[in-house]
Each structure stands twice: as C-alpha cells, then as structure tokens.
C-alpha cells in the first residue's frame, strides 16, 4: 500500500561528509504530515555498531525505522562490515515483497566510507564522500561540495553549515540541527 501524499510523514534533510579520516552525519529536526509541521526536534540520526557507524533516515518514519532495524541486523551478522551489510540489506529489499513497499532511504557513514541505500534498494557510494537524502538534500549537497572545495572546515562543520543552507531554502527543513561524528 502506497502512502498518500497527505498522510506521509516526510520532509527532512540528512547529510554526511567524510574528510581527513573523520565522518559526520547530521539532520534537521522537522517532521511534516502533509502540509503541516508536527514536530520540530525529531532525531533522525542513530549511532550503530558500538558507535563506529552513523545512520540517518528520510522518508516514511515507520518504514525508515524498519529498514534501520534490518540494517542493524545485517551489521551484526557481518561483523560491522558496512558495505557487505548494505549490499545484503539491498538484496533483501529488492526480493522481499514487504520490504519493497517501504518508502525510505538511509544515509550511512563510517570514518572510511559513506553510503546511501536508496528507496529502490540500490547501494550508492558517492565519489566525493558526501551523502545526502531527503527533501533538502540537493541544497545541502551543493553547499557541502562548495565548502569541501573552498574551505578547511572539518566534516562536522561542513555538515552543520550545509544543513543551515538547506534550512534557509527548503520549506521542509528546519534549523534544529543535530550533527554527530565518528
């Protein structure tokens, strides 16, 4: 069953950056139901596998949390190997009837790797070490790329400033920003 546009809880920006052997992942806090903001301080970032990984989610909240739980199971099964766990989750996502109906995306970072698991079950590893998902993702991505290219800011600062830029532009992104680092 597809979520109707009015009943879908959506609207977020999650961005992760790798720089100098460190990773940061951050998100805004806005949750929207249809055209109404229902919460300003939603936590969309989770620390995983004994604090070695960070995961953020966008999309239908219940769907995203289901995927996050499945991803954690895969991490445990594959001893924290990020890429292997992501590929196995994507494989399940594509073949399982129930999972295929989930409308969510995950952005995952470690100190060495940044991945997106898309809503179609694809695993994407961006070449520039920047992952961005959600309604304000393209604004945050553009800001992060410019900051990576033209400043010496560390990963957490880039994430923070990129989210501020997205919040200034995207109506579904607010400035209640949470950034975590590994």
Swiss-Prot record:
Na(+) binds at residues 167, 170, 173. PROSITE patterns: PROTEASOME_BETA_2 (PS51476). It catalyses: ATP-dependent cleavage of peptide bonds with broad specificity. It is an enzyme of class 3 (hydrolase). Signal peptide: none annotated. It is found in: Cytoplasm. One of its GO terms (biological process) is proteolysis involved in protein catabolic process. Keywords: Allosteric enzyme, Cytoplasm, Hydrolase, Metal-binding, Protease, Sodium, Threonine protease. Its EC number is 3.4.25.2. GO terms for cellular component: HslUV protease complex; proteasome core complex. Allosterically activated by HslU binding. The active site is at residue 12. One of its GO terms (molecular function) is metal ion binding. A double ring-shaped homohexamer of HslV is capped on each side by a ring-shaped HslU homohexamer. The assembly of the HslU/HslV complex is dependent on binding of ATP. Protease subunit of a proteasome-like degradation complex believed to be a general protein degrading machinery. Belongs to the peptidase T1B family. HslV subfamily. This is ATP-dependent protease subunit HslV. The lineage of its organism: Bacteria, Pseudomonadati, Chlorobiota, Chlorobiia, Chlorobiales. The gene is hslV.
């Amino acid at each position: 069953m597809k979520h109707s546009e009015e009943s879908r809880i959506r609207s977020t920006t999650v961005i992760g950056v790798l720089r100098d052997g460190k990773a940061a992942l951050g998100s805004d806090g806005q949750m929207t139901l249809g055209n109404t903001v229902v919460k300003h301080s939603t936590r969309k970032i989770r620390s995983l596998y004994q604090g070695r990984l960070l995961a953020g989610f966008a999309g239908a909240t219940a769907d995203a949390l289901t995927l996050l739980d499945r991803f954690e199971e895969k991490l445990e099964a594959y001893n924290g190997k990020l890429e292997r766990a992501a590929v196995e989750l994507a494989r399940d996502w594509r073949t399982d009837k129930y999972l295929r109906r989930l409308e969510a995306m995950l952005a995952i970072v470690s100190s060495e790797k940044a991945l997106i698991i898309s809503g179609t079950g694809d695993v994407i590893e961006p070449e520039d070490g920047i992952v961005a998902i959600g309604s304000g993702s393209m604004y945050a991505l553009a800001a992060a790329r410019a900051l990576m290219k033209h400043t010496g800011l560390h990963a957490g600062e880039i994430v923070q400033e990129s989210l501020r830029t997205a919040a200034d532009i995207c109506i579904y992104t607010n400035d209640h920003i949470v950034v975590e680092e590994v």
